A protein has these predicted regions:
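His/Met- and acidic-residue-enriched segments that coordinate or traffic transition-metal cofactors
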Residues: 1-59
């Protein structure tokens, strides 16, 4: 993996982690159940993206 590719993956990891955290934070503050569910689902997707990127780094 080139240094540029590694930097891209590291940046993407940070963004996915931040997005997961924000979605979970907003979900905990929202009273509307449908919005809470949507944000929780988004947080799960960002966690999956994070895990996928981590798997690429560990190969």
């Amino acid at each position: 993996m080139t240094p540029k590719e590694l930097m891209y993956l590291e940046d993407s990891l940070g963004m996915e982690q931040q997005l997961e955290t924000k979605c979970n934070d907003y979900a905990s503050k929202i009273q509307d159940e449908s919005l809470r569910t949507a944000l929780t689902n988004l947080a799960s997707q960002h966690k999956q993206h994070f895990n996928c990127l981590m798997n690429q780094l560990n190969q």
